[in-house]
Swiss-Prot record:
Cofactor(s) listed: Mg(2+)
Chain positions recorded as Mg(2+) binding sites: 258
Entries under Gene3D superfamilies matching the protein: Bira Bifunctional Protein, Domain 2
GO cellular component: cytoplasm
Subcellular location: Cytoplasm
Assembly description: Tetramer of two alpha and two beta subunits.
PANTHER family hit by this protein: PHENYLALANINE--TRNA LIGASE, MITOCHONDRIAL, PHENYLALANYL-TRNA SYNTHETASE
Protein name: Phenylalanine--tRNA ligase alpha subunit
SUPFAM superfamilies, per database record: Class II aaRS and biotin synthetases, tRNA-binding arm
EC top class, as a word: ligase
Family from the record: Belongs to the class-II aminoacyl-tRNA synthetase family. Phe-tRNA synthetase alpha subunit type 1 subfamily.
Length: 337
């Protein structure tokens, strides 16, 4: 076969190859083990030395031309593939940005901050304290000594470790221990709320093993039950932002207050109109508790109350199931953004 024709055929075949696979197949026709140029090189041994030298030089020139055409086509296919990819992945920098999603407060945290703001506006401090408590602060200081029947009212999470008296540490079952700690470090008048996480062995649509609570304490020389009623009623009206709220105090029992009362509220309008809704426990601080705070119960008196932050949130927003606050379902949480 004429060398010029072989080179021309190779160049045409390479140029018509639409992809790398086809190009490699065409390469084998001319440069493979049985390719046209390879066969010519094999036949050089049959020629005399002078003719072998001349013909070998011509074949090598043709081979170089074929390899150059092959390299050029490979590069052209690679460039085309790159351009195709760049086009597919192109970014229009003139398009508006997507922006980062805006976060928002959890509904219970909204309630937490709202409670702090309302009580802060009338002079209450905010106390903080450990969630892992000692037996004395969680029970004994609050008039629930060992074997007191009131302890059976709460199923408690006990944890590894013991306090200085050798008693098992526990997860606090209410935030009252923070009030005792605060009172032992401050002098009357004492006005403080203690919001925080608490733990009890309980879980259903209206109870959770971990929940948030806020407790309030006011101790001074001339505090009465009327002050408790006025402060808490005013809080409810500010929290729910409405004046059509009726409040009643039902006699009850708590070991740390005497007398004690459950606080119920009722809206005069809206879907809950006419329904008494339990909202808080309260009472005048028991003399034993005042004594455990390092104060003289003959001189000082006070009131205390405790409310669940989830309970307040459920009533404010009309949420029926407490567990929704802990499931992290964005469809639910976005309603409060």
């Amino acid at each position: 076969m004429d060398l010029d024709q072989i080179v021309a055929d190779a160049q045409q075949s390479f140029e018509q190859a639409a992809d790398i696979t086809t190009l490699e197949n065409e390469k084998a026709r001319f440069l493979g083990k049985s390719g046209a140029l390879t066969e010519l090189l094999k036949g050089l041994g049959k020629l005399d030395p002078e003719a072998r030298k001349t013909e070998g030089a011509r074949i090598n020139v043709a081979k170089q031309q074929v390899e150059a055409a092959l390299t050029a086509r490979r590069q052209a296919l690679a460039d085309a593939l790159l351009n195709q990819r760049l086009t597919a992945e192109a970014i229009d920098v003139t398009l508006p940005g997507r922006g980062a999603g805006a976060g928002s407060l959890h509904p219970v945290m909204r309630t937490w901050e709202r409670v702090e703001q309302i009580f802060g506006s009338i002079g209450f401090d905010v106390a903080d304290g450990p969630e892992i408590e000692t037996d004395w602060y969680n029970f004994t200081s609050l008039n629930s000594p060992e074997n007191h029947p009131a302890r059976s009212m709460q199923d408690t999470f006990y944890v590894e470790g013991k306090d200085a008296d050798g008693r098992q540490l526990l997860l606090r079952t209410h935030t009252s221990p923070m009030q005792v700690r605060y009172a032992r470090m401050n002098r009357p008048p004492i006005k403080v709320i203690a919001p925080g996480r608490t733990y009890r062995v309980d879980s259903d649509a209206t109870h959770s093993p971990m929940f948030n609570q806020v407790e309030g304490l006011w101790i001074d020389e001339n505090i009465s039950f009327a002050d408790l009623k006025g402060v808490y009623t005013d809080f409810l009206k500010k929290f729910f932002e409405r004046d059509d709220i009726l409040v009643r105090f039902r006699p009850s029992y708590f070991p740390f207050t005497e007398p004690s009362a459950e606080i119920d509220m009722m809206f005069e309008q809206g879907k809950n109109a006419g329904k008494w809704l339990e909202i808080s426990g309260s009472g005048q601080v028991h003399p034993t508790v005042i004594r455990n705070m390092g104060l003289d119960p003959e001189r000082y008196i006070g009131f205390a109350f405790g409310s669940g932050l989830e309970r307040l949130t459920m009533l404010r927003y009309g949420v029926q199931d407490l567990r929704l606050f802990f499931e992290n379902d964005l469809r639910f949480l976005r309603q409060f953004a």
